[in-house]
Amino acid sequence: MASLKEMRNRIGSVKATQKITKAMQMVAAAKLRKAQDAAQNARPYAQRMASVIANLAAGVSGDGAPKLLAGTGSDRRHLVVVATSDRGLAGGFNSAIVRAARERINALSAEGKDVRVITIGRKARDQLRRLAGERLVATYEAGSNPSLAVAEEVSARIQEMFEAGEVDVVHLVFSSFKSVVTQQPTVRQLIPAEVAAGQAPLDLKGATYEYEPDEEQILETLLPRNVTTQLLSATLENQAGFYAAQMTAMDNATRNAGDMIASLTLQYNRSRQAQITKELIEIISGAEAL
């Protein structure tokens, strides 16, 4: 059995850990509000752009549709973009995203597709490096705050690969922020743009619009921006989900530390009481012997 000194040291160590987890919980809670506002503010723009694209796509013939909308006519080469956070200590948040990415990569590979991978966030890079191997073509850090610059850089690389004929279909794997307690791993097709399965076309209230320039030219401008917008929106959703998951994980850790402190304190008190009782018995026995 551990000595009283060892037990006191262990209780002190757990208390120190509890202070750290409590502080991390409070920091995550403070950052969550800002991240949640940013994610929610970005949604209407991304949804509106998807609606505009769906409306414009309805007036475009198959031959005149841009490649980012119509595709290359093949689905042999796939690119999977996986977005996680750079840091951990957030429960199973990053693992759930990586698991969804693994399932998609393995499913595509089983179908005989040529799969390549781009990661955003160190956790995705570290966990997928062995699975992807040489198929991991680029890695990016998510950063402490999602930025348009990173989204534009990743978007440019994706579109460069698409225009060069290196990929036919692009998938984005990230975590949708549903609520503080719910973050859902999501797989979304970026290229070709999924207008039919995405947002409904705009309600034009019976009006007929003539576009100048025509729909094809507008889509040629909007579709590249849509890729960037969807990437930025996904990283913002990830950020909110990460802080929510971290806040929950640190709250659980703080509670568990409290339970452990209570258990160790009870054990310490019992051991101390037993030791005192033993010493008293020895003193009484010694006195009686005299």
Curated annotation (Swiss-Prot):
Localization per Swiss-Prot or TrEMBL: Cell inner membrane
Assembly and oligomerization: F-type ATPases have 2 components, CF(1) - the catalytic core - and CF(0) - the membrane proton channel. CF(1) has five subunits: alpha(3), beta(3), gamma(1), delta(1), epsilon(1). CF(0) has three main subunits: a, b and c.
Entry keyword Membrane: yes
Pfam families linked: ATP-synt (PF00231)
Annotated NCBIfam families: ATPsyn_F1gamma (TIGR01146), PRK05621.1-4 (NF004146)
Residues spanning the membrane: none
Superkingdom to which the source organism belongs: Bacteria
Gene3D superfamilies linked to this entry: 3.40.1380.10, ATP synthase, gamma subunit, helix hairpin domain
Main localisation: membrane
Membrane topology according to the record: Peripheral membrane protein
Molecular function (Gene Ontology), one example: proton-transporting ATP synthase activity, rotational mechanism
One of the protein's GO biological processes: proton motive force-driven plasma membrane ATP synthesis
Function: Produces ATP from ADP in the presence of a proton gradient across the membrane. The gamma chain is believed to be important in regulating ATPase activity and the flow of protons through the CF(0) complex.
InterPro entries assigned: ATP_synth_F1_ATPase_gsu, ATP_synth_F1_gsu, ATP_synth_F1_gsu_CS
PANTHER family given in the database record: ATP SYNTHASE GAMMA CHAIN, ATP SYNTHASE SUBUNIT GAMMA, MITOCHONDRIAL
Disulfide bonding pattern of the chain: none
Cell inner membrane as UniProt keyword: yes
UniProt protein name: ATP synthase gamma chain
Source species: Phenylobacterium zucineum (strain HLK1)
SUPFAM superfamilies reported for this sequence: ATP synthase (F1-ATPase), gamma subunit
